[in-house]
């Protein structure tokens, strides 16, 4: 058993024992999908290279927890996993441990080790300390012995030690050294149990940032027994915070992803959460899927120091948002309806004071989007929600049912876009669109467009579209939509204009989400020069279900619509079908766009338009008529966009 003597290293996941039985294999943390989003959303499925028993599942890795991917507590992937092992493959762990550390500690070895008492001894004995073996003895860890500094510590060293997580379990685990070491070994963390023991939470124990780092958080066990998560988990980076403050730590453990999740979250909730947050550790937690946990109760935790938690992407989510950290760079961020920070650069971030921040940040890619969200909910001239909340309820948060709908929509009021694009010359793209990066065609750059100047200043410069309100040009995104529409319209060739040029028919398009409608509207403009489009606006509320108060006639909902004016009824029908077919193939918000045909008995007299240069001059390729039916009337600009 003690074949190779005490296992050496901290178990970088490679099982440096040479013999596969070393539980050392605890999972390494594998390059945790470090993907583009730095803020370790790292769901990390650590790859756990474990040489360990076959039993040793890869660790759960916690994803590089910080932008630079360094795992805070210690840079080596402190074998993150051997999650299940400690209890799991009872034999596995035991045996495995045995293998390496098994050394003397033999007790630690196999079930025996597992045995509380035996384990205790093992842990106690240097043997326990012995690399994995000791850890394996996890049991040792279990016993207060495990807690024992050396014992626990050693265990910690070997992934097995982690296994010893049990040790952590014992108050002993909490014991400084003991806990810490354990933490070192992923096992430590793993032995969520360890964390479990108050000991784990215990300062030093928690300190075993490693532990936290380790699957500790990962070990669902760890995360699970909120406690477990607390101790070890918190230990994770959070551990730094005395173990994330007991439970809080757990949240931090979140890093373990698993830990963070579920119970972990709870931990976050507890003040502990705050503590964890405090330490960078907190952030770590956020990093792991733990973030998820954060979202839940974690959120509460976030409230407190949670801010730190916020740091982790997850953190950002629920709680994080809450805490100042909220902004966190995490994507979830905004979720937190917390007062929180203005949301770092994360996607949802802004969080701002009203939970659903203004998602301005939306395109992480785009540098500009950076912090820009209305940080603290401050000047938002008219928030749709507060607008007319008839009740005296604090207008700040829309009625419960409503929030989710906002989110996807990219919430600002429609009009806010004017203010926003402004000077940066990315005039007309509502936040959703921004995701595309600066797709706006450069031609639209200077805020007043080439021609605006000669305009006699007819309207304020800047604003949404560089030139006049409503002359958005083409750009690859809208062109794409237009292409789809043209293809569908090509199915039937019908008259689109009449000699009278009166606008007697229309298509009313509504639903979906504001951004999807907006984009469809811009696409329609490119596809059908013969139509005229109203700006996007909002539908009023209809009836309240059941008896009871009905909405006021003026009450605006957040559902948008726009109208397409056309000259022939037949083309209106064709266009309706085309739009229906175009949106039904698309994903969520878009496919919910609804269309219906209208007809205007006496037609709608759209005001005549004269090309801008000189009254009546045939500028812009228009034929100088009153623009009523000149097909390219107001789209004339398109060419020079």
Curated annotation (Swiss-Prot):
- Give site residues, Interaction dimer-dimer. Required for episome maintenance and generation of immortalized B cells in the host: 518
Effect caused by changing residue 386 to A? Decreases interaction with CSNK2B. No effect on interaction with USP7
The UniProt site entry described as Interaction dimer-dimer is assigned to 491
Q: Does the keyword Hydrolase apply?
A: yes
InterPro entries linked: E2/EBNA1_C_sf, EBNA1_DNA-bd, EBNA1_DNA-bd_sf
What's the reported outcome of changing residue 392 to A? Answer: No effect on interaction with CSNK2B. No effect on interaction with USP7
Q: Where is this region: Nuclear localization signal?
A: 379-386
- The residue ranges flagged as biased composition, category Acidic residues, are 620-641
Pfam families in the record: EBV-NA1 (PF02905)
Q: In the UniProt annotation, what is the result of changing residue 491 to E?
A: Loss of DNA replication and cooperative DNA binding
Which residue windows does the record flag with biased composition (Basic residues)?
41-50, 458-470
Effect upon mutating residue 388 to A: Decreases interaction with CSNK2B. No effect on interaction with USP7
Q: What is the effect of changing residue 391 to A?
A: Decreases interaction with CSNK2B. No effect on interaction with USP7
**Could you tell me which residues belong to the region Disordered?**
1-128, 224-478, 612-641
Catalytic-site annotation from UniProt: 518
- Using the UniProt annotation, give all residue ranges assigned to the region (GAr): 90-325
Segments of this protein annotated with the region Chromosome-tethering GR1: 40-67
Which EC number(s) does the record attach to this protein? 3.1.21.-
Give the protein's recorded name. Answer: Epstein-Barr nuclear antigen 1
- The species this protein was found in: Epstein-Barr virus (strain B95-8) (HHV-4)
């Amino acid at each position: 058993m003690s074949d190779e003597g005490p296992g050496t290293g901290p178990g970088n996941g490679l099982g440096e024992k040479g013999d596969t039985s070393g539980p050392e294999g605890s999972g390494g943390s594998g390059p945790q999908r470090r993907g583009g989003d730095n803020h370790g959303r790292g769901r990390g499925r650590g790859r756990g290279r474990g040489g360990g028993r076959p039993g040793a599942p890869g660790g759960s890795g916690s994803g590089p927890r910080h932008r630079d991917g360094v795992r805070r507590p210690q840079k080596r992937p402190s074998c993150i996993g051997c999650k299940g092992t400690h209890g799991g493959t009872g034999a596995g762990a035991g045996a495995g441990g045995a293998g390496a550390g098994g050394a003397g500690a033999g007790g630690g070895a196999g079930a025996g080790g597992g045995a509380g008492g035996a384990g205790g001894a093992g842990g106690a004995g240097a043997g326990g300390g012995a690399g994995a073996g000791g850890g394996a003895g996890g049991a040792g860890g279990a016993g207060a012995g495990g807690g024992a500094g050396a014992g626990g510590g050693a265990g910690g060293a070997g992934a097995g030690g982690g296994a010893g997580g049990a040790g952590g379990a014992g108050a002993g685990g909490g014991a400084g050294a003991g806990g810490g070491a354990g933490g070192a070994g992923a096992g430590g963390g793993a032995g969520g149990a360890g964390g479990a023991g108050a000991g784990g939470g215990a300062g030093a124990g928690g300190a075993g940032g490693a532990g936290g780092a380790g699957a500790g958080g990962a070990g669902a066990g760890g995360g699970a027994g909120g406690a477990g998560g607390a101790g070890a988990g918190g230990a994770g980076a959070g551990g730094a915070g005395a173990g994330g403050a007991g439970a809080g730590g757990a949240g931090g453990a979140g890093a373990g992803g698993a830990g963070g999740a579920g119970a972990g979250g709870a931990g976050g909730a507890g003040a502990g959460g705050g503590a964890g947050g405090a330490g960078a550790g907190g952030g770590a937690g956020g990093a792991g899927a733990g973030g998820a946990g954060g979202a839940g109760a974690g959120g509460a935790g976030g409230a407190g120091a949670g801010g730190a938690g916020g740091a982790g992407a997850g953190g950002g989510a629920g709680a994080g948002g809450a805490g100042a950290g909220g902004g966190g760079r995490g994507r979830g961020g905004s979720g937190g309806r917390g007062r929180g920070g203005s949301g770092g650069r994360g996607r949802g971030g802004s969080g701002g004071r009203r939970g659903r921040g203004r998602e301005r940040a939306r395109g992480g890619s785009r540098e500009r989007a950076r912090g820009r969200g209305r940080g603290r909910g401050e000047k938002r001239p008219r928030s749709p929600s507060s607008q007319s909340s008839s009740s005296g309820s604090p207008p700040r948060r829309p009625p419960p049912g409503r929030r989710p709908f906002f989110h996807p929509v990219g919430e600002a009021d429609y009009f806010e876009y004017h203010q926003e694009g402004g000077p940066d010359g990315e005039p007309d793209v509502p936040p959703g669109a921004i995701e595309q990066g600066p797709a706006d065609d450069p031609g639209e750059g200077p805020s007043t467009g080439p021609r605006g100047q000669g305009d006699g200043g007819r309207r304020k410069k800047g604003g949404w579209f560089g030139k006049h309100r409503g002359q958005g040009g083409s750009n690859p995104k809208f062109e794409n939509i237009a292409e789809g529409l043209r293809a569908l319209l090509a199915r039937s060739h019908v008259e689109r204009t009449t000699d009278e040029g009166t606008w007697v028919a229309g298509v009313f398009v509504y639903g979906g989400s504001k951004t999807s409608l907006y984009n469809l509207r811009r696409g329609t403009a490119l596809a059908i020069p013969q139509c005229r489009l109203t700006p996007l606006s909002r539908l009023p509320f209809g009836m309240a279900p059941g008896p009871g108060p009905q909405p006021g006639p003026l009450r605006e909902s957040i559902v948008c619509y726009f109208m397409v004016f056309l000259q022939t009824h037949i083309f209106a029908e064709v266009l309706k079908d085309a739009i229906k077919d175009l949106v039904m193939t698309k994903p969520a918000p878009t496919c919910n766009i609804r269309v219906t045909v209208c007809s205007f008995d006496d037609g709608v007299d759209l005001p005549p338009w004269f090309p801008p240069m000189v009254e009546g001059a045939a500028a812009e390729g228009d034929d100088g008529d009153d623009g009523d039916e000149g097909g390219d009337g107001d789209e004339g600009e398109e060419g020079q966009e």
